[in-house]
Structures are given as C-alpha cells and as structure tokens.
C-alpha cells in the first residue's frame, strides 16, 4: 500500500518514508515472517483519520484488525515491536534469559538516545553544531563498541531486537557517508562490521522504499544541512 486510507488487512503499518522508528517495526515484522500492509502518510499534511487514532500524532502506528471489524491502533515503536514479539510466531527476537533480555532492552533504549543525537547531527546548519553532534555520536558508538563481543550481529549469529533497532540508525550513515566522510565510526571496527552485516539483511534492505536515499538527501537540502556544505 502506498498512500491514503489504510485497508482492511489484519495488520497495517502506518508509515513515513524516512522514519527510522517505522523501520524498526517493519524489520521485526519481516523477521517474524508476518504479512502486513503499509500505509504511507505525509507528516506535513496528516489526514484526519490519522489524527483521530494517533494520540501523539506520530508514526508508526500498527493497526490491528480484530473480529467483527474492530480495529485497535497501537502507537510508539517500542510498544509495537514488543507486541509483535509477544503475539506472532516465528523466531524469537529477545533472549530467553531474563537478565540478558533486560540488558538487550537497555541497549535498545541507548539506540533511541543515538537517534535523538542523530537528528541534531543531520539538521545542524553550522560547523560548530555539526562537530559537537558528530563527537557525541562517535562517543556513543564507542560505548557500543565496548559491548560487542560476538559477530555478525549484536548477540552473535542470532538476529535480535537490538539489531532491528540499530539497523535504521546505520542506514542514515550509508547516505551520509556517500556525501562526506563523517568519521563517526573511525575508531569502532566492530561497529563497522556489525553495520555491514545488517546492511545485507533482507529484512533491513526491504524496510524502506527504493528512493529512500534520494528522499533523505532532499530532506538534508531542505534543512540546509552542514553535511552538504562539507561535500561542496
């Protein structure tokens, strides 16, 4: 599904083309082997039906159709991903051990903090703001480097929820690094290897549309991003 009103599928993921939080849910659904529809909306011109069911006015939403044509709307990517993990068959994305599972959830929250810094990085319009955010991101990935003890994924051979959370973060840098060398991962070889492994995962590759890179570059241009000035 592309744009407009969501259809009557059992699961519909209400999306925006660039949103990393939407990508999280799309990756988890794909890893579980769950069929779902996607409905893309323009966040600058949100339709009335979206306002009616989205308390925070944000994507993603997961519309869950129940018996009798009753539809529940789940919001917040973390909630959606946990719901999918708990209700859908397929490979488990969380560890079975409670302590290990809690540790994974901690690094998921850390990934969300990286996304917050990444927003400031990509929208920085001057050299000082850009460099401050660049250093902050490099430092956070340095923390991640220290906990990566297995390969190719966060927990070794098994793709986990943590991988689904970090894959959209790394996708940003696939575009950024095609514009200019950010050097964010210069001191983190294990993170670089993890990033490469996630890039080749089908669920990750298919979580966005083919024009993702063009859309992100257009967004950077609209924001007068300093990253583009470096490239120039």
Can you say where each PLM-predicted feature lies in the sequence?
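Hydrophobic/aromatic-lined pockets within catalytic cores
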Residues: 85-89, 112, 149, 174, ...
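GST superfamily/GST-like fold recognition
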Residues: 154-179, 184-193, 197-198, 208
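GST-like domain detector, emphasizing the conserved glutathione-binding G-site
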Residues: 1-146, 152, 223-227, 231-232
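Conserved G/P- and acidic residue-centered "switch" motifs that form tight phosphate/ATP-binding loops
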Residues: 19, 163, 201
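Short acidic/histidine-centered micro-motifs embedded in hydrophobic/aromatic stretches
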Residues: 107-110, 121, 167, 210-214
């Amino acid at each position: 599904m592309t744009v407009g009103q969501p259809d009557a599928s059992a699961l519909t993921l209400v999306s925006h083309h660039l949103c990393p939080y939407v990508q999280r849910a799309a990756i988890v659904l794909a890893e579980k082997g769950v069929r779902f529809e996607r409905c893309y909306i323009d966040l600058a011109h949100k339709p009335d039906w979206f306002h009616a069911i989205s308390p925070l006015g944000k994507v993603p939403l997961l519309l869950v159709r129940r018996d009798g044509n009753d539809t529940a709307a789940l919001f917040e990517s973390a909630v959606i991903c946990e719901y999918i993990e708990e209700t859908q068959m397929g490979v488990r994305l969380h560890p079975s051990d409670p302590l290990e599972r809690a540790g994974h959830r901690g690094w998921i929250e850390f990934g969300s903090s990286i996304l917050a810094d990444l927003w400031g990085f990509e929208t920085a319009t001057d050299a000082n703001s850009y460099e401050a955010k660049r250093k902050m991101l490099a430092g956070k990935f340095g923390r991640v480097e220290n906990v990566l003890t297995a390969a190719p994924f966060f927990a070794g051979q098994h793709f986990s929820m943590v991988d689904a959370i970090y894959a959209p973060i790394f996708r940003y840098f696939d575009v950024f690094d095609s514009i200019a060398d950010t050097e964010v991962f210069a001191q983190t070889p294990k993170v670089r290897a993890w990033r490469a492994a996630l890039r080749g995962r089908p669920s990750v590759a298919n979580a966005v549309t083919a024009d993702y890179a063009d859309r992100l570059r257009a967004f950077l241009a609209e924001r007068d991003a300093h990253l583009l000035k470096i490239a120039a």
